[in-house]
Amino acid sequence: MRTVRYTTEALRNLKRYGTVATRVRKAMDDYAADPAAHANNVTRLVGSAASRMRVGDYRVIFVETPVELTVVRIGPRGGVYD
């Protein structure tokens, strides 16, 4: 199982979207434990080493390594890619 790490910006985003924070944390923990379970919700971003996961109307931008997932940003569907 890989560990999930959150950047300072991602933690700020989690506090801002409090009601969604629980769902985001659970989705990332589930993906870290079994990537195949959420494979249809994860897409590699074009021109970047990052990937994104869909959690309802929110997107989680993260970087994957063999030992950890680093969550970079969390936000609503339209503005998270800016």
Regions found by a protein language model. Name each.
Residues 29-54:
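A short, surface-exposed loop/turn module that caps and links secondary-structure elements
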Residues 22-23, 45:
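Lipid interaction determinants
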